[in-house]
Amino acid sequence: SSDWVALYSVLVDFYKPDFHLLRTALKQRKVNTLDELSAALDEVRQTREKIKSSGAFRTSIEQMEAGLKRELARVRLEEQTKQRREEDTRRKADLAQLAEVTALLPSLVHGFDYSRAIDLLTGLRFETTDVRTAVEGRLYLYSSARDFTKQLQLDLIGKGWTGTLTQRSGVTLTGTASLAAGSSDLQIKVEGGTITIPFDSIAPQSLIEMAQSFTTQVTDSTDYYHRQELAATFARAAGLDQLSTTLAAQLMEENRPFRSRWMKVMEAGI
């Protein structure tokens, strides 16, 4: 009887697509990169889902799928290890450059002129996150310190200030201080005449005291908080760490945006 031939023909027709699918899945291919391995694994998975047989064909596909998974895990681990090594190398280089910059910055500050330090920091580009944060913290600090002196000079030009100020040398002067627009010298009216001294000769602590006296006259809350922030950053840039911490602590309780900016200064270890 030829019934078996007809039956075999039906079976062949039924499994014929599996031959094609398996031949395609088992063909030699380039699978060296993560993308190539992922593509091959996807194709094998799709083949496994499509084949109808449950014997040797399926076993071959499942073995290939398992092998590709192992290879994918191995290559992924190698890539991660390579990436970590590259990141470590880059981080060490960034930290070394940051150390050089940090050592150089003080020499770029002349009196209360922070422009050179700001220019240097603005031009720096780092890939390491914590190093970039450290640079951002320093740039924020010096930029705010510059803005502090600008604001104080504007106040002195517009209003003047009366009280006792201390110079860096330790000499104290009591009188009314004023500043002419475009001038870098402070005019101090004292008993018996007027004394002219460079703005940069005043002790940082005295500058903050002068600025705070102007701040107490401010009624706008935004301006008030901004001035307090400038005072805190200037104090830190000038090396008055304790005063800076006190001013910043008070401000952080009331001003959340400042808190996030100040945290960069803290994280930078300034």
Question: How would you describe each model-predicted region?
Answer:
Residues 1-73, 77-270:
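Compositionally biased alpha-helical segments
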